[in-house]
């Protein structure tokens, strides 16, 4: 039986599910950019790409060299094809306008070019997260200049989302709104090949991911929930749990998608004015779309992530996502 490449899968989606050709082309271009980023990441010190730039992004985070390189790769790969009206990146202050010399399309691309970049110098997994939205009609005319407002759509409006994870293998995990597929990069072929046909998250779990060093800063519902997890089979949950933490959302969520679990990045008392740490548009929305399509759930502790109306490109949010039972439990504690 012949192997199904990403290109073949997308063509079959166009035939069977009427996936627009422009969306198919967009996903293929993003995938090619991810292959280029994977190549740059794999070179490491040999390519002179390790270390920091000495600059900060709009989030106030020190930019790694590969943050900037990955951002440029995605911009240059996607700006010319005629399938996008604009782009937004975690690494840029403002929305990216498609240069006037190129045709414009009906979609918006939002991305975190290199999630978990603090892991680069220690050779731990990193990844690229992306989300695709339709551009509102008023911005498709030549009379209305594209601005931030075009991107401020709730996660329910995503038409596609995915991530590439650069680890022992490079994988692309994708949803077009009809389940979650996983593609592994065959470096000899140069193609992403379908290896995980229907990714599903078990409803219950015995694993969780959280940065325990921040415990003293958590709100009471999170402290209560984690204490119950740590109590194991002698506690109220009556089973033992394992904790995992890679310090890259893309790696922690990938583990949860492939074998179940709960990922938590709650708000804390160090910055009480901020509702959380992770970015709604670049991280929480695409990952929540994937998790829900895989049968899981995702909330900010109070409401469904995908229902949140964004107020800014770089809005932050608390995140609890993964197996349904555990997400429901910790969300319920926030409501008590």
From Swiss-Prot:
<dbReference type="GO" id="GO:0005829">
    <property type="term" value="C:cytosol"/>
</dbReference>
<dbReference type="InterPro" id="IPR028343">
    <property type="entry name" value="FBPtase"/>
</dbReference>
<feature type="binding site">
    <location>
        <position position="112"/>
    </location>
    <ligand>
        <name>Mg(2+) 2</name>
    </ligand>
</feature>
<dbReference type="InterPro" id="IPR000146">
    <property type="entry name" value="FBPase_class-1"/>
</dbReference>
<dbReference type="InterPro" id="IPR033391">
    <property type="entry name" value="FBPase_N"/>
</dbReference>
<dbReference type="GO" id="GO:0000287">
    <property type="term" value="F:magnesium ion binding"/>
</dbReference>
<keyword id="KW-0119">Carbohydrate metabolism</keyword>
<feature type="binding site">
    <location>
        <position position="115"/>
    </location>
    <ligand>
        <name>Mg(2+) 2</name>
    </ligand>
</feature>
<dbReference type="GO" id="GO:0042132">
    <property type="term" value="F:fructose 1,6-bisphosphate 1-phosphatase activity"/>
</dbReference>
<dbReference type="GO" id="GO:0030388">
    <property type="term" value="P:fructose 1,6-bisphosphate metabolic process"/>
</dbReference>
<dbReference type="GO" id="GO:0005986">
    <property type="term" value="P:sucrose biosynthetic process"/>
</dbReference>
<keyword id="KW-0378">Hydrolase</keyword>
<keyword id="KW-0479">Metal-binding</keyword>
<feature type="binding site">
    <location>
        <position position="211"/>
    </location>
    <ligand>
        <name>substrate</name>
    </ligand>
</feature>
<dbReference type="GO" id="GO:0006000">
    <property type="term" value="P:fructose metabolic process"/>
</dbReference>
<dbReference type="GO" id="GO:0006002">
    <property type="term" value="P:fructose 6-phosphate metabolic process"/>
</dbReference>
<feature type="binding site">
    <location>
        <position position="112"/>
    </location>
    <ligand>
        <name>Mg(2+) 1</name>
    </ligand>
</feature>
<feature type="binding site">
    <location>
        <position position="283"/>
    </location>
    <ligand>
        <name>Mg(2+) 2</name>
    </ligand>
</feature>
<keyword id="KW-0963">Cytoplasm</keyword>
<comment type="similarity">
    <text>Belongs to the FBPase class 1 family.</text>
</comment>
<protein>
    <recommendedName>
        <fullName>Fructose-1,6-bisphosphatase class 1</fullName>
        <ecNumber>3.1.3.11</ecNumber>
    </recommendedName>
</protein>
<comment type="subunit">
    <text>Homotetramer.</text>
</comment>
<feature type="binding site">
    <location>
        <position position="90"/>
    </location>
    <ligand>
        <name>Mg(2+) 1</name>
    </ligand>
</feature>
<dbReference type="Pfam" id="PF00316">
    <property type="entry name" value="FBPase"/>
</dbReference>
<feature type="binding site">
    <location>
        <position position="114"/>
    </location>
    <ligand>
        <name>Mg(2+) 1</name>
    </ligand>
</feature>
<feature type="binding site">
    <location>
        <begin position="115"/>
        <end position="118"/>
    </location>
    <ligand>
        <name>substrate</name>
    </ligand>
</feature>
<dbReference type="GO" id="GO:0006094">
    <property type="term" value="P:gluconeogenesis"/>
</dbReference>
<dbReference type="InterPro" id="IPR044015">
    <property type="entry name" value="FBPase_C_dom"/>
</dbReference>
<feature type="binding site">
    <location>
        <position position="277"/>
    </location>
    <ligand>
        <name>substrate</name>
    </ligand>
</feature>
<keyword id="KW-0460">Magnesium</keyword>
<dbReference type="Pfam" id="PF18913">
    <property type="entry name" value="FBPase_C"/>
</dbReference>
<comment type="pathway">
    <text>Carbohydrate biosynthesis; gluconeogenesis.</text>
</comment>
